[in-house]
Each structure stands twice: as C-alpha cells, then as structure tokens.
C-alpha cells in the first residue's frame, strides 16, 4: 500500500509549502516506502530510495513566477506506481480498485476506454464532479470501485475521498494560524506537525481544499445503504404497499408526473394525447397527462388504455404473452380500449412501463399506425432494461432490446434514437435513474441499477 498526502498553503510563502512537503515525505519514509513523488501545482519530481534534500523539491526558477497555486500532492510506496497514467495526471491512490473489468463500457468513459483503470476512474470521476457538478454521483461512482483513499488535484483544487468501508485511514487538519491544511493517509503525520488540528475523515466523505476557501467537507455518503429494487415501484409492488406515507398508486402517478415535467421542458416531445399500454402503467399515464397539460393546455386528458393484457377471459395470457393475441384498439375484445376517432391524425404518446424485448411496443405501434395516427412517441416509465435482474426475470426471453447498446452510447438521447428506429416509433423517451428516483421519492443512492444504467443520463438538463 501507499502513503498519500495533499497540502494547501494559504500564504504566498513557497518555503512554508516546501518545508511541509519535506517533513511529510521524511516521516512517511520511516514506514519503509521506497518510491516517492511530489507534485506542486504543475511541477513534478520523483525518485526511488531515500528522499534527498530540499534541492529535489521542484523549483520554479527559484521564485513563484510559474506557480499558479500553492498546493501539491505527495505519494510514497514500496514500489513504482502500478498505473502508468499516474505520470500524467494529478491523482494519488492509497488502496486498490474492484469491479473494473467493464469500466470500458461506462457511458462516461469517453476517450479513456482503452486507458488503464486509474485513468478511466479519474476521467469518469472528474466528469461527474467537475463537469456535471454532481458530487453525490461522483462519490457513489468511486465507492463502487475504490477500496481506500483517492486524492485528485485539478485546476488549483484538491479533492480527497475515503471510501465508505473505511478500509484505509485518512486524516485532515489545519494549523492554528489557518495558513496550511493537510490531508493524509497516515496518522503518523500528527507527530511532525503538533500545531495541526488533525481529525479523522469519516468513511464516505469527500474533502475539498483550495487557497480561496480553505478546507471544506463537500459530501458524506451514508456508510450503510438500504438497496431497493426500483422495479417494485413500476410493476411488482402489492397494491397496499406504501412509500413515504403514500400508496403505490400515488407513487406511480408521481413517477409519470415528474417524467412529464422533465420531458415537456428538456426534450423535443410533441404529443396530443397519451395512453397506457398495457394496464399496469395506467397510474403513470394519469400522472403524466395531468402534468403535461400544465405545459400544453390543449393536451387531451384521456384515461383509456390501448390494450388490456390482464383480461381474465383470455387464459392464454397467463401462459405466454408472445403466444396470446393482444387485444388491440380495433379488436373490441377488451373492456378498456380507445376509439379510432380519438387518435386518428394525432400525435400519440404510448406510455409503457418497460421496454424489454420490444415485441409489445412494436405490435402496439403497428396497430396505432393502422388506424391512422400521425406519430407515435413511446414514453417509458422505467429506465433501460439491459439486465434480467432489473425486471425480476419476468420474461424468459433474455434478448433485452437495449442490452446490445451497453458501451455503445454515452447518453439517453442517443439510446432513445437507436431504440426508436428498432421499434418503428417516431421517438422514444426512456426514464433516467435521477428522474425515476425523484418520482419515487427515494435517493438514487438507495436504488439498485446496473452501473451502465445508473450513469446513463440525459445530456440536456
């Protein structure tokens, strides 16, 4: 394992920063570390063996003219870094990574897909934390893969995270004059700096340091998680179930309401009416329609459904939805169906609970077009289904239509476009984890999603 530390000097005195680096490195080398590396702003120095004198600290023409920020990182280990990317990025690691085999498929990995694991994690973490400004999701991502501590220096700021298991110690402190702050993975640094007020960084905590704002605790993830299957709120929950004091029916209406609010504001959706297919997304349709009408007053508040596969008169439905004849809008076999004159030459929204294999959606779209609709937009209450565990293995057909796009699309917009072409729809709008969790009323952190789905979001927000 390694020893890591980060130092921020709030004064313009370079010598103070250098002295803290020297003392930190020398103290940590007593633990038998052989390889050392220091980064002060954009200046880098490294070596193997005992740490030499101050002359090995990176110089800037003996002044501070090229130092934009009085901050830096230190790293010590018994061996040279495992990851070559440490030579080009401002990241130090004390610990190891887990479950990294499929990181190259992550929707946010971008051009780092073929890089080493540290660089992949650095790029995704930076994109979530810096580019998207989502500290909670950034820390959740790290927590999936990090066992230990990771510290990153970027644009004059230090970010240090301790994973929620508390696998490795991490301390932070500021001197009594509020002139220097330190984050370190070794408790032994308390010895050379008796004037520092050190305290333990809690597991799951993200610390930020910069010269303008000092040391800040940005976020603390819960150390325990109650993971809930979000599919329960789409289909499987018992009708008497409650969440946050509300019945499951009201929760499902809210899922539709939140999705309508998002799509009407942040997408190019254009529909005149929306209908559920089959029966179980009807609450989502009611919530969706009521909210959508707040944005589009002429929207038709129809409560009919396109197809009721749960009509007990059709016993075949209990055995195979692929074999049974779906009772579509023109058949009249269902007690609930919409009439041709209600939808002809209109832009119709098709509210689906999920899209699994796509068979149901394709057939419904076929019949809608047959009766003369102007366009069909498929609105999916659930997130993309790419794993049988997401739908309780409800279908024995494992060829989930979205599965082949894992690692192929960086955003929900692109996935929507590809799936719409496969289904023959004009448009498709999947729900996203963040929008779905808002509708359910439970933090994304406590809902279970496969990693690729968890970080697949809409770009335009």
Predicted regions and their residues:
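PRPP-dependent phosphoribosyltransferase catalytic core
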Residues: 157-158, 162, 179, 196-198, ...
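Flexible loop/turn segments at secondary-structure boundaries
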Residues: 14, 167-168, 190-191, 215-216, ...
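Short glycine-rich phosphate-binding loop at a beta-alpha junction
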Residues: 268-280, 377, 428-431
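Short, glycine/charge-rich flexible loops or terminal/linker lids adjacent to PRPP-binding catalytic cores
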Residues: 290-348, 386-397
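Phosphate/diphosphate-binding loops
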Residues: 261-262, 273, 328-366, 404-423
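A conserved beta-strand->alpha-helix junction
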Residues: 118-122, 296-314, 422-438
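Conserved short alpha-helical segments that host acidic/polar catalytic motifs at enzyme active sites
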Residues: 1-202, 208-272, 277, 344
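Conserved hydrophobic/aromatic pocket- or pore-lining residues that grip, position, or stack substrates
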Residues: 207, 259, 274, 284-288, ...
